[in-house]
A protein has these predicted regions:
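Accessory carbohydrate-binding/adhesion or oligomerization-edge regions at the termini
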Residues: 1-60
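Short beta-strands within extracellular/lumenal beta-sheet-rich domains
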Residues: 66-84
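Active-site and substrate-binding clefts of carbohydrate-active enzymes
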Residues: 127-217, 221, 245, 253-254, ...
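Catalytic alpha-helical scaffold of carbohydrate-active enzymes acting on polysaccharides/glycoconjugates
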Residues: 230-248, 268-283, 298-357, 369-379, ...
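Fold-level signature of zinc-dependent metallopeptidase catalytic domains
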Residues: 255, 259-273
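Alpha-helical scaffold elements lining the catalytic groove of polysaccharide deacetylases
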Residues: 331-352, 420-440, 722
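C-terminal (or distal) subdomains of carbohydrate-active enzymes
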Residues: 373-378, 388-392, 400-403, 437, ...
Length: 982
């Protein structure tokens, strides 16, 4: 006879206690007066503080009505008389909703309601009035918090049933006991705690709850007796001991844009700040950390009265600005200068409004951190760095430290904290115990940090979190805890700690690798505008030195728009479609504004501080050649550093006999090349070095099925190569243009839904091979890459970081190397032997696949969540294949990459000082207009000395003067900033 499993039908002790706990919570609300006079008006938010109303009139809102629309705003008014029975009592507004609501009562901001809290305290702010008038503004997002979870649809759906609004009073005895039991039940249910203590808690909670007769008038007396029993028997017990030391830091992560547009973040931020300020009124021990200068700036602009209240709490030390940066940016894709400006404009705001320089960087949710960050932070007045995802989201390896020292690409060091548990918790005992057990630096790092507060869409700390925290000292089995601010934790545990471990390298996140590629157009425009604003600042500065006005405010406005759109859910592509459209609109505005600042000149200006000598395409209607559909000609500009010259079409054209084409083969002064019909290169013999560069696939376009699952826009899985989508040759490779400078071959490939045109150009006077791509992309769950298997024996690939390069292993000896199958790079990667190698230089791509001898440049993705239209449409981009002798540094790959990415600008300006030896990263006027600020970065890993014809100020990146000198010794990969008095 088969064994039949017996299903347990009786309740476990903790389940029986939990059931009665639910009964107890019904009695928290004492008096409950329905508010009947409620009206609502629906709207669509169109800017940060402007709305388009669907109707001119308010309509009645009654219990049972559907209200709110997806991605919709609603304005709600309500009015109620306060009966004599409720006067002189502590009154609350009770409203259970899935929306996010800001509440004013009798003209005063009293708090916020959202899915994490359902009531707002009124009495301290409105006194004891006869009548209360409510004005509420609510927002309802376009999707549920978690569409994977069917239960979340009912709680946080886009359309919801109005369950009524009430004026209520709270039974403080019930509420207090609820918090006691909630705290203890969390321990009883968690296997992280001592089993004997959990049994003790369950037994004694049962005894306490047995004192309450829920169905009789003696219930209030029983509740008081149960409260006393819990205190005297459970909380007083010290027979069980815990261990650990955990700092509790309150914060709220606020995504500027994600499943909502940036314009909605203004109200999300107001609601979050209001809630914390109101909690501070009631909990004198409460300290709260809040990041992103942009959120403070928007609060000051749109809600100045709340900002003034916030400033008072900042002065008290209870509301703590953290983060240093303007927003929480992605830390892989932005340029070094963009990351500097994030700190510069962030610190500028904090200094001007709070009189302080923030000494920490607070980036809990970013998708990995570039190796260039420590130097930037250190030179922006930041000593401490906080992130989180490496310890909680890695898919393969556990990041080995939580409190440590992070050493940057140039040797700069900052203290770093990567807390062992998620940055969104609700401060329950089990979460704190989990944090301590996961903490890896118990012997060297001091306390561990546990962040608490709801986040992503803001919200922050709740009354429940603070009440539970007040009970921690009564529970002997828990780690020791102390509530403190973020800066206090960092300074107490990290500053001067000589026992801390050191991490020297990038902080790579083993997840979200797809964000290097998703939303390709945003990444292309971001890079183009990063360089265009560099040009605009340099040109404007040189003009200002000749007496012209400097457009400082316009440049600042443009920079801030760029910085906002580098937020870690905008530039990486992990957002809904309206966010994408907002970013495009910002980029169009910035592009147009910068064009107006730059103007137009007869000559071409070389903003690079080295001679431009790479063959370049110049647009000209009379030209005989084309590039990206524009007519023009190819020539070597030979423009001196920071100088300008008129470029004209050469009078003499070379014969086209330099390129011998025979079917799918071509011979140039540099190479003998063999092509496949799809544009792949099957042979590339370098005549200069007498060596073959191809050893397998080379310039092969491949499209893969790309189904990472839940985190569609975010992730690429290691098995993406399992299924290759067949590419048909729509139009085989053929010669299309041949001139005295360039020879072009065109091939068109396709899938059932997409068309991909590749134009391969080879040149008479340059060894570069350019591949232009024009794509009409209509795929779903696909990843396009171009693959290279060079005939090079190297166990590492050099990858540009934007301010130096990083060497990454190509082998898979360890799980750490295997997990880095897709990494972020900037303008180029290079794989070389000591006497030569291959560089691939791009104009807008960031993802690089690394698999032993095969390297791949990620070109396009096609994801559906959270944006079903992601990347659909037309794309144009190019990359260079650049074989060379010697190393990447010997071959000046950085210079070639800068020339490829920074087009010549028409402007009649020049500069005598060319700052040889380092890359001119930025030139601008200081904020006070007193100095010309010049930023230079060493890109090739070499030491050097720079001498100046006059004394200059050495500055930090915040433009503070450090000292005067006429020469500077610089280290490999160092960024220096100098100030030249006007």
């Amino acid at each position: 006879m088969a064994h039949i499993k017996v299903v347990r039908r009786s309740m476990r002790p903790e389940e029986w206690n939990d059931l009665r706990f639910g009964w107890l919570k019904r009695y928290i609300i004492n008096d409950k007066l329905p508010i009947d006079n409620i009206v609502i008006k629906d709207a669509r938010q169109v800017t940060e503080n402007n709305y388009e109303f669907y109707s001119d009139e308010f309509r009645p809102l009654k219990k049972g009505d559907l209200y709110f629309t997806p991605d919709g705003t609603a304005f709600i008014k309500a009015e109620t008389e306060v009966p004599d029975s409720l006067k002189n009592k502590e009154l609350w507004l009770y409203l259970k909703t899935a929306a996010e609501i800001i509440v004013k009562a009798n003209g005063k901001f009293v708090g916020g309601i959202d899915p994490n809290r359902d009531r707002v305290l009124l009495t301290p702010y409105i006194g004891a009035p006869d009548k209360i008038k409510f004005e509420m503004q609510g927002y309802n997002r376009s999707k549920p918090d978690d569409e994977r979870n069917p239960e979340s649809l009912a709680v946080r759906g886009c359309r919801q049933i109005f369950n009524g609004a009430y004026l209520v009073t709270i039974d403080r005895d019930v509420q207090s006991l609820v918090y006691d039991i909630e705290t203890l039940l969390d321990i009883a249910k968690s296997e992280l705690f001592n089993e004997d203590y959990r049994k003790f808690v369950n037994t004694e909670l049962n005894n306490a709850l047995n004192l309450i007769d829920f169905d009789t008038d003696s219930r209030p007396t029983g509740i008081k007796e149960a409260k006393k029993y819990v205190n005297d028997v459970i909380f007083a017990n010290r027979d069980y001991k815990g261990s650990g030391d955990v700092a509790l830091v309150a914060h709220s992560h606020l995504d500027i844009a994600y499943y909502w547009r940036r314009i909605h973040a203004v109200q999300k931020n107001l609601r979050t700040v209001l809630i914390q300020l109101r909690l501070m009124d009631r909990y004198p021990e409460f300290k709260y950390t809040h990041t992103q200068a942009y959120t403070y700036e928007s609060l000051k602009q749109y809600y100045p009265e709340v900002f003034e209240e916030l400033k008072k709490r900042v002065k008290e030390g209870r509301f703590e600005p953290v983060g240093a940066m303007y927003i929480e940016p992605d830390c892989n894709i932005p340029s070094a200068e963009s990351l500097i400006r994030q700190c510069f404009y962030g610190q500028l705001f904090f200094r001007e409004n709070f009189g302080k320089t923030i000494n920490n960087c607070w980036l809990p949710d970013v998708f990995g951190n570039s190796w260039i960050l420590p130097q930037i932070l250190k030179k922006c007045g930041v000593d401490y760095f906080v992130s989180n995802k490496m310890s909680t989201w890695n898919d393969t390896n556990r990041f080995p430290h939580n409190n440590f020292i992070w050493k940057g690409i140039d040797g700069s060091e900052v203290y770093a904290c990567v807390p062992p548990t998620h940055f969104i918790t609700w401060n329950m005992p089990s979460q704190i115990q989990e944090n301590w057990e996961a903490y890896q630096d118990k012997n060297s790092g001091g306390q561990t940090m546990s962040m608490f507060g709801y986040g992503d869409g803001g919200s922050g700390v709740t009354e429940e979190m603070l009440e539970v925290m007040r009970r921690f000292d009564k529970i002997s089995v828990m780690p020791k805890t102390k509530h403190m601010g973020g800066a206090e934790f960092l300074e107490k545990n990290l500053k001067g700690n000589t026992s801390l471990a050191k991490w020297d390298g990038e902080l790579y996140l083993e997840m979200h690798r797809g964000t290097f590629t998703t939303k390709a157009n945003l990444k292309k425009l971001n890079r183009r505008l990063e360089y265009k604003i560099r040009e605009a600042e340099i040109i404007s500065t040189l003009r200002a030195m000749s007496g012209f006005d400097y457009p400082g405010e316009k440049l600042k406005e443009c920079y801030k728009k760029l910085l906002i759109n580098q937020f870690h859910d905008i530039l990486p592509g992990s957002h809904i479609n309206p966010v994408y459209n907002d970013a495009l609109a910002d980029y169009v505005y910035v592009d147009k504004t910068l064009s107006g600042i730059i103007g137009y000149g007869e000559a071409y200006f070389n903003s690079l501080n080295f001679k431009r000598k790479e063959l370049t395409f110049f647009e000209d209607e009379d030209g005989s050649e084309t590039r990206f559909g524009k007519k023009g000609f190819w020539t070597v500009p030979n423009i001196a550093p920071l100088d300008c010259t008129v470029i004209e079409k050469p009078d003499e054209e070379f014969s086209d006999e330099w390129c011998i084409v025979n079917g799918n083969s071509a011979e140039t002064p540099f190479y003998r090349i063999k092509f496949a019909s799809d544009g792949s290169i099957t042979g590339l013999h370098d005549k200069r070095l007498d060596r073959e560069w191809v050893n397998g696939v080379f310039n092969r376009l491949e499209i893969y099925e790309d189904n990472p699952g839940v985190y569609d826009a975010w992730d690429i899985l290691p098995n993406y190569t399992d299924k290759i989508i067949p590419l048909k040759v729509v139009s085989p490779l053929k010669l299309t243009e041949k001139s005295g400078e360039a020879c072009s071959f065109r091939v068109t490939l396709g899938t059932e839904n997409s068309k991909w045109e590749r134009i391969i150009r080879i040149f008479r006077c340059s060894p570069k091979i350019e591949v232009e791509n024009n794509v009409d992309w209509h795929e779903k769950h696909k990843l396009a890459k171009v693959l290279f298997s060079p005939n090079v024996l190297s166990r590492e690939v050099l990858c540009d970081t934007g301010a130096g390069f990083i060497a990454r292993e190509t082998h898979k000896n360890t799980s750490w190397q295997s997990a880095r199958f897709e990494c972020c790079h900037h303008k180029w990667f290079d794989v070389s032997e000591t006497d030569g190698g291959i560089a691939v230089i791009n104009d807008s791509k960031y993802g690089i696949g690394i698999s032993e001898n095969t390297l791949s440049l990620s070109l396009l993705r096609a994801t559906e969540r959270p944006d079903p239209e992601s990347d659909i449409g037309k794309h144009s981009f190019a990359y260079l294949i650049y074989p060379h002798s010697g190393s990447a540094v010997d071959a000046h790959i950085n210079d070639i990459a800068f020339e490829f990415n920074i087009p010549l600008t028409r402007a009649d300006v020049s500069c005598q000082n060319t700052f040889d030896g380092m890359f001119l990263q930025a030139m601008k006027l200081s904020e006070d207009g007193e100095m010309v600020v010049v930023r230079l970065s060493e890109q090739n890993g070499r030491r050097g000395k720079m001498k100046f014809p006059q004394q200059v100020y050495v500055l930090n990146m915040l433009e503070d003067k450090l000292y005067l000198t006429d020469e500077i010794d610089y280290k490999p990969f160092e960024i220096i900033t100098i100030g030249i008095l006007r």
